[in-house]
């Protein structure tokens, strides 16, 4: 059975890619260039797909940055530092992003005759990103199932999982986390201060494993 995975190049979606492949699906991956400052994540997504021999497509919707300003896409907005629970992190919300990405991904999945579409929303995203909440996932499941004759099924298997639990699952699957990128700033090295870096570092610490990527700051693992 064919399945499409929405792949950002970060920890969660990369783990999901390995996970779906391990279940015996014929996997296709899709990523989006939506004007994000951290577009280098797509370089890592491409490398992972090459490693796993998974067909990979990048869809350029850079125009979206003009329609939906955010600290992730607008050049003169600074990426906030801290934790996802901080109110300043709302600046990183790209309005309606996941609904747009999932809709395009669904069209791609339907064109392939895929029965399932996977994306990596997880419990740590819930406080700040409305389009990663369980209620949103359920609503999109219904909408996408009804949107075409094929009855496409949307799956978000990590929606109730913490990031450290996703990491544990990834380590079981042999995920190469050196080929993942999380930092919102998109520099040469991960900043170690933005919300996604902070969450990633905490996950590795909780699991008791050193993150294989480089950071701009010194981290006591």
Curated annotation (Swiss-Prot):
One GO term under biological process is: queuosine biosynthetic process
The EC designation for this entry is 6.3.4.20
- The name of this protein is 7-cyano-7-deazaguanine synthase
- Spell out the reaction equation it catalyses: 7-carboxy-7-deazaguanine + NH4(+) + ATP = 7-cyano-7-deazaguanine + ADP + phosphate + H2O + H(+)
Q: Which InterPro entries match?
A: QueC, Rossmann-like_a/b/a_fold
Keyword Zinc appears in the UniProt entry: yes
Kindly list the positions annotated as binding ATP.
Answer: 7-17
Q: Give, as in the UniProt entry, the pathway in which the protein acts.
A: Purine metabolism; 7-cyano-7-deazaguanine biosynthesis
User: How many cofactors are bound and how?
Assistant: Binds 1 zinc ion per subunit.
Keywords (A to Z) from UniProt: ATP-binding, Ligase, Metal-binding, Nucleotide-binding, Queuosine biosynthesis, Zinc
Q: Which positions in this protein are listed as binding Zn(2+)?
A: 183, 191, 194, 197
Q: Which cofactor does it need?
A: Zn(2+)
HAMAP family noted in UniProt: QueC (MF_01633)
What would be the name of the gene that encodes this protein? queC
Q: List the top taxonomic levels of the source.
A: Bacteria, Bacillati, Bacillota, Bacillota incertae sedis, Caldicellulosiruptorales
């Amino acid at each position: 059975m064919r399945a499409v995975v929405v792949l950002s190049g970060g920890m969660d979606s990369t783990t999901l890619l390995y996970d779906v492949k391990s279940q015996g699906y014929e996997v296709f991956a899709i990523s989006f260039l939506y004007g994000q400052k951290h577009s280098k994540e797509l370089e890592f997504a491409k490398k992972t797909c090459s490693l796993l021999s998974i067909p990979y497509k990048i869809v350029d919707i850079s125009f979206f940055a003009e329609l939906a300003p955010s600290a992730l896409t607008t050049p003169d907005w600074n990426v906030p530092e801290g934790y996802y629970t901080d109110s300043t992190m709302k600046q990183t919300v790209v309005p309606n992003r996941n609904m747009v990405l999932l809709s395009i991904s669904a069209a791609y999945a339907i064109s392939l005759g895929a029965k399932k579409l996977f994306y990596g929303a997880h419990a740590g995203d819930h406080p700040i990103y409305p389009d990663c909440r369980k209620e949103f996932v359920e609503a999109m499941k219904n909408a996408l199932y009804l949107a075409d004759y094929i009855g496409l099924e949307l799956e978000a298997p990590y929606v109730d999982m913490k990031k450290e639990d996703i990491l544990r699952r990834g380590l079981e699957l042999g995920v190469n986390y050196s080929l993942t990128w999380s930092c919102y700033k998109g520099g040469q090295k991960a900043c170690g201060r933005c919300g996604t870096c902070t969450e990633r570092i905490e996950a590795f610490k909780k699991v008791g494993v050193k993150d294989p990527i480089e950071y701009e700051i010194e981290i006591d693992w």
